[in-house]
Amino acid sequence: MARGRKMSKPRAVEAAAAAAAVAATAPGPEMVERRGPGRPRTNGENVFTGQSKIYTYMSPNKCSGMRSPLQEENSVAQYEVKCQGKPLAGIYRKRDEKRNSGNAIRSSMKAEEQKIKDARRGPLAPFPNQKSEAAEPPKTPTSSCDTPNAAAAKQGLKKPVRGKQAPRKKAQGKTQQNRKLTDFYPVRRSSRKSKAELQSEERKRIDELIESGKEEGMKIDLIDGKGRGVIATKQFSRGEFVVEYHGDLIEITDAKKREALYAQDPSTGCYMYYFQYLSKTYCVDATRETNRLGRLINHSKCGNCQTKLHDIDGVPHLILIASRDIEAGEELLYDYGDRSRASIEAYPWLKH
């Protein structure tokens, strides 16, 4: 026993020295309080608090009362442990930020999808999963005697489901309305002639009348104070062809020679009509007596006919057309257009 006691002294001394060394390396309470438990250091190290135990080499039969005060203090002492790595607080904070940002993005995407669905559905269309509060009756406790009412209520709740098919029917109706009319009826072409076609037909008719020499719808009659004149026997519409002023088509040089010869005989009269065509002066000489009626139409400043040039294959023809609607029985008149002093002195009726 005495030998065992002697051997325990060096072991106790060694344990006390080890506890003192650990206590010297551990920070004091002031440092722990100032930094705070679990607070990260500035160099990126995390600090953890823990408890250190010094297992003694003493015999287990010895009680704690025989331990030195230094051993008891160090057995429950708290100290800080350094852990190399990134701060855990920063890692947790970044994870929370990513989670929050993901939730915000998902919520914004859901809101945009809902807006698009609302725009397609229209302002008056109900949501597909939304039940109308007016159609849904308030829930009341039902008893065994109210089973018929419960069945009727269930049928009433099923009615809105039938109403959901109405938009489909409307959509089908719209597609039917958008069909073309030509799908049901053939395309009809207008039988009315265009303005160009009418003008072409009228021109061909005038060509035939000029070339054939037909003069219809008029006759020769004696007019008081004028002599012979032409009377309409049918109605002429405005712009309609009446008659051609037919005669010899000559140039200005030949016309002057003939006019000098006609002036020698006062009973001959003047039946020469001058006009310009393609910047050149021509004359229609109708002095020679023929059965054509155009040369016998008298003069008037307020006539119902007017002259017009009509070419056939490059050859000009002088024709008379109705300047207004002409009734049957009216005398055909047109303005000669000669206002020279010599002509008025020779033919005073040119004033009227």
From Swiss-Prot:
Residues 109-121 have a biased composition (Basic and acidic residues). Residues 156-172 have a biased composition (Basic residues). Ubiquitinated and degraded by the DCX(DTL) complex. Its main location: nucleus. This is N-lysine methyltransferase KMT5A. Although the SET domain contains the active site of enzymatic activity, both sequences upstream and downstream of the SET domain are required for methyltransferase activity. It catalyses: L-lysyl(20)-[histone H4] + S-adenosyl-L-methionine = N(6)-methyl-L-lysyl(20)-[histone H4] + S-adenosyl-L-homocysteine + H(+); L-lysyl-[protein] + S-adenosyl-L-methionine = N(6)-methyl-L-lysyl-[protein] + S-adenosyl-L-homocysteine + H(+). One of its GO terms (biological process) is regulation of transcription by RNA polymerase II. The lineage of its organism: Eukaryota, Metazoa, Chordata, Craniata, Vertebrata. Protein-lysine N-methyltransferase that monomethylates both histones and non-histone proteins. Specifically monomethylates 'Lys-20' of histone H4 (H4K20me1). H4K20me1 is enriched during mitosis and represents a specific tag for epigenetic transcriptional repression. Mainly functions in euchromatin regions, thereby playing a central role in the silencing of euchromatic genes. Required for cell proliferation, probably by contributing to the maintenance of proper higher-order structure of DNA during mitosis. Involved in chromosome condensation and proper cytokinesis.
